[in-house]
């Protein structure tokens, strides 16, 4: 009888074939956990040893939750929805998935909750595509520098702190200073681009409301509908009555919807209103999950909370489709303190900030933008040639005006040049004012700023500046529309355009009546006196002998 010999090579090959052909049956083993604690929007679950971080869990009543704290023996879960029906002893099931939301063009014109479910009463949203909330942002090699302007329609921003497609521009200020109004104006200003039908010009907009009053969100929606802007806008609403978990994920839901369009080569604008309330919701959740508190009781990863969100805003390279996601995060300060924890975090993440001051707001300067400390780190790269040419002296003129204004407050006598700078500065500040929900087209912004910086408004009384501006622009649209067309189409401002505007403004001044009844441009020019009309006085100087 021959001996049975087993060679090691055969055993190794057999094991290798078995490993390569093995396919685990996920359905064969389903983990079931048990709720050990529930309350205040969180739950603790035991018995799910294989659960992953940020995995979606499902409770008995169908409510979903996100696995956050993976501890020995139990998991800390953020409940997404009503937690009142979750009780100790109930079962919890793993889904094997991370949180995702439906995406697609069907979301345009709709109002949804942080899970992507419609809440506007217009029926279900028909879409087949989904996108995960926690996806990696575009890498360095997938991006390109910001170079295309995104017009806000607000003169102070487009001229002094320009925003480009793919930029993150922080809107920061105290409560009730017009932060939301600035962002809504920017959304409304995209209407002309949307109606053009040009995919390279069209901008889809997303407004994420975190912790706002329900009436405030309804007011924003009404304003957008009245302006015809809801056609290209999606609202993700997580009002103050929502659980902390919803407020925490709402900005990620909005960015997931926007990223879907960005990676299709489209342009997107997203407004986060506001990230202060998201940070507070995340702090509440973290403290309930017993995470160690840090500065101002925020958890240690609150910087990562915002950085991973805002890094998703990008201008993609041509190879990736050249789409863009522009972010306008809003941060609320207390007593204009920008050195607090969350404001400094977001300032360091973003590409610039627009600072709104309550003092300026109360003085009637609206939008209440402090142009001195507002900055755009993208700068002129996100401006048209026309705007670059006319704003050169605007920032310097405003800076000199602020310095002289502080000096003149002491009652000191000023020379003629300083008085002229003060007069022009007051007119420039008046020129930067504009009404809410009334954004300016780019060509009209250029004309207004050109008129102010070149001295054509120096003879217009300060109280008549805004009326002069609106009537002059209406006159141009009516009588000299070609000038505006040239600026809009070429995005440049040449000498011929400047000459044509100079002639037009001189003609218009002859018809403009100031509030005191004076017609501008009707004063006869001063003529030189004849030599015989000039009296000559002889001054005798007495000589004194020196000692």
From Swiss-Prot:
Functional description taken from the UniProt entry: Produces ATP from ADP in the presence of a proton gradient across the membrane. The alpha chain is a regulatory subunit.
Q: Where is the signal peptide?
A: none
**What UniProt keywords are attached to this protein's entry?**
ATP synthesis, ATP-binding, Cell membrane, CF(1), Hydrogen ion transport, Ion transport, Membrane, Nucleotide-binding, Translocase, Transport
Q: Does the keyword Heme apply?
A: no
EC supergroup of this enzyme: translocase
How does it sit in the bilayer? Peripheral membrane protein
Q: Per the UniProt record, which EC number(s) apply here? A: 7.1.2.2
Q: Which InterPro entries match?
A: ATP_synth_asu-like_sf (IPR023366), ATP_synth_asu_C (IPR000793), ATP_synth_asu_C_sf (IPR038376), ATP_synth_F1_a_nt-bd_dom (IPR033732), ATP_synth_F1_asu (IPR005294), ATPase_a/bsu_AS (IPR020003), ATPase_F1/V1/A1_a/bsu_N (IPR004100), ATPase_F1/V1/A1_a/bsu_N_sf (IPR036121)
**Organism, as annotated:** Thermobifida fusca (strain YX)
| Assembly and interaction partners | F-type ATPases have 2 components, CF(1) - the catalytic core - and CF(0) - the membrane proton channel. CF(1) has five subunits: alpha(3), beta(3), gamma(1), delta(1), epsilon(1). CF(0) has three main subunits: a(1), b(2) and c(9-12). The alpha and beta chains form an alternating ring which encloses part of the gamma chain. CF(1) is attached to CF(0) by a central stalk formed by the gamma and epsilon chains, while a peripheral stalk is formed by the delta and b chains.
Protein name, UniProt field: ATP synthase subunit alpha
Coarsely, its chief localization is membrane
User: Mind telling me which GO cellular component terms the entry cites?
Assistant: plasma membrane; proton-transporting ATP synthase complex
Tell me the gene name: atpA
Q: Which cysteines are joined by disulfide bonds?
A: none
Q: Which Gene3D superfamilies match?
A: 2.40.30.20, ATP synthase alpha/beta chain, C-terminal domain (1.20.150.20), P-loop containing nucleotide triphosphate hydrolases (3.40.50.300)
């Amino acid at each position: 009888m021959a001996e049975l010999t087993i060679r090691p090579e055969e055993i190794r090959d057999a094991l290798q074939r078995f490993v390569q052909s093995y396919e685990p049956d996920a359905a064969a083993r389903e983990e079931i956990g048990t709720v050990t604690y529930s309350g205040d929007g969180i739950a603790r679950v035991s018995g799910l040893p294989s659960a992953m971080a940020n995995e979606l869990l499902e409770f008995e009543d169908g409510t979903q939750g996100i696995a956050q704290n993976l501890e020995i023996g139990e998991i800390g879960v953020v409940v997404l929805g009503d937690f009142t029906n979750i009780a100790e002893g109930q079962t919890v099931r793993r889904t094997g998935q991370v949180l995702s939301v439906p995406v697609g063009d069907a979301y345009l014109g709709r109002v949804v909750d942080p899970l992507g479910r419609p809440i506007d009463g217009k029926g279900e949203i028909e879409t087949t595509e989904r996108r995960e909330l926690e996806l990696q942002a575009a890498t360095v090699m997938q991006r390109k520098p910001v170079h295309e302007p995104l017009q806000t329609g607000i003169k102070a921003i487009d001229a002094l702190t320009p925003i480009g497609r793919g930029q993150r521009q922080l809107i920061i200020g105290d409560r009730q200073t017009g932060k939301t109004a600035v962002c809504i104006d920017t959304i409304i200003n995209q209407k002309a681009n949307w109606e053009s039908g040009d995919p390279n010009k069209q901008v889809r907009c997303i407004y994420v409301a975190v912790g706002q009053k329900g009436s405030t969100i309804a007011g924003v929606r009404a304003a957008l509908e009245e302006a015809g802007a809801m056609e290209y806008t999606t609202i993700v609403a997580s009002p103050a009555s929502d659980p902390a978990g919803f407020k925490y994920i709402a900005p990620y839901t909005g960015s997931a919807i926007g990223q879907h369009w960005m990676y299709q080569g489209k342009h997107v604008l997203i407004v986060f209103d506001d990230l202060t309330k998201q940070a507070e919701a995340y702090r509440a959740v973290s403290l309930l999950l017993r995470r160690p508190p840090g500065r101002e009781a925020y958890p240690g990863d609150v910087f990562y909370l915002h950085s991973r969100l805002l890094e998703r805003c990008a201008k993609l390279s041509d190879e990736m489709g050249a789409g863009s996601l522009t972010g306008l995060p809003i941060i609320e300060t207390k007593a204009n303190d920008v050195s607090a924890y969350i404001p400094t975090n977001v300032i360091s993440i973003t590409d610039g900030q627009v600072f709104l001051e309550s003092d300026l707001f109360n003085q009637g300067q609206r939008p209440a933008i402090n142009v001195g400390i507002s900055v755009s780190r993208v700068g002129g790269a996100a401006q048209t040639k026309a705007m670059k040419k006319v704003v050169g002296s605007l920032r310097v003129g405003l800076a000199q005006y602020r310095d002289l204004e502080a000096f003149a407050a002491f009652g000191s006598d000023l020379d003629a040049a300083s008085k002229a700078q003060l007069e022009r500065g007051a007119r420039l500040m008046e020129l930067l004012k504009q009404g809410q929900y009334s954004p300016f087209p780019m060509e009209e912004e250029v004309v207004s700023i050109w008129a102010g910086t070149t001295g054509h408004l120096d003879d217009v009384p300060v109280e008549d500046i805004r009326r002069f501006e609106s009537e002059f622009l209406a006159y141009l649209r009516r009588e000299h529309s070609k000038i505006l067309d040239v600026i809009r189409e070429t995005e440049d401002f040449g000498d011929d355009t400047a000459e044509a505007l100079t002639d037009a403004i001189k003609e218009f001044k002859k018809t403009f009546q100031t509030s005191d009844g004076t017609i501008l441009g009707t004063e006869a020019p001063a003529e030189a006196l004849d030599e015989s009309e000039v009296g000559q006085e002889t001054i005798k100087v007495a000589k004194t002998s020196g000692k």
